[in-house]
């Protein structure tokens, strides 16, 4: 209640300064915070398995090692499966390259006849674009090295988070007064449930989308249907923009391996139907219901955090907002912010309710 005694301009200035400082810190410390955020996400997800091992009287260090080993085996199995499919793709890469070169020549000829741009001028434009993209290539290579460093740090962070779980929980309880113990416990429990439910729901959604993608590509007789369907499902896990990117790969493969454009049209129709099913049935029932964040906030946060942390930020943004909503809903002064993030739409806003109260009060006074 004390914060409401300050003038509005002072509160607004303090809040804006705090937000600016927070954004600057998130951007500058991205290399540290992104792997730590992923590690916290995975540690919360792995906690039930770790707790079950502890219930069997397995020593703490051994339980953590077994938990991490299980995670590494699962990730290795998925990567092995994808790499085996990519090897088949690599075997036919020369043929795909030749077909792609032929299509490029046809496009260049069409541009020359349609727009009057000579092939030589087109090549100069492409060379300029390639020179301008050298910086982008360097950034991409840097991102790959960053990814390897994240993969190295993840097991270390997860190990430490599980090892010091009781210490961290004790700290969170001690920084608040004893009368707030129930609120802290409720926030921690709901955060754990929301993150676990969200990630599990996301994996279930990805599995269903992978089956639908592969089935559609098999029916359309697209090469590497299994690989493309699974990659599409993985990309689809990136909120809002992943599904759009996922359709480009099968379209590209169909263009260089098929004659005509009927297959490409079939891919667009099939993926549009799958996206409709995903966005209107799977996501609301399996994923969004777990975090209770409205679509407007989700899109804005995905774009904002994505601009700070890249693709990793788009994936982490929804769980981060879900945790903020849980905290806001438990603090009296921040409850309006929790309602703003939520997906419950009131039939009347508070301005209408207060206006009706004043009118009723005025009528009573007249009587």
Map each language-model feature to its residues.
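Anchoring transmembrane alpha helix of integral membrane proteins
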Residues: 1-84, 158, 322, 326-329, ...
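Hydrophobic alpha-helical transmembrane segments
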Residues: 4-22, 83-105, 139-156, 211-220, ...
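Alpha-helical transmembrane segments and their immediate interhelical loop/hinge regions
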Residues: 11, 143-257, 261-267
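Membrane-spanning helices that line or support transport/gating and their immediate boundary helices
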Residues: 28, 32-36, 48, 52, ...
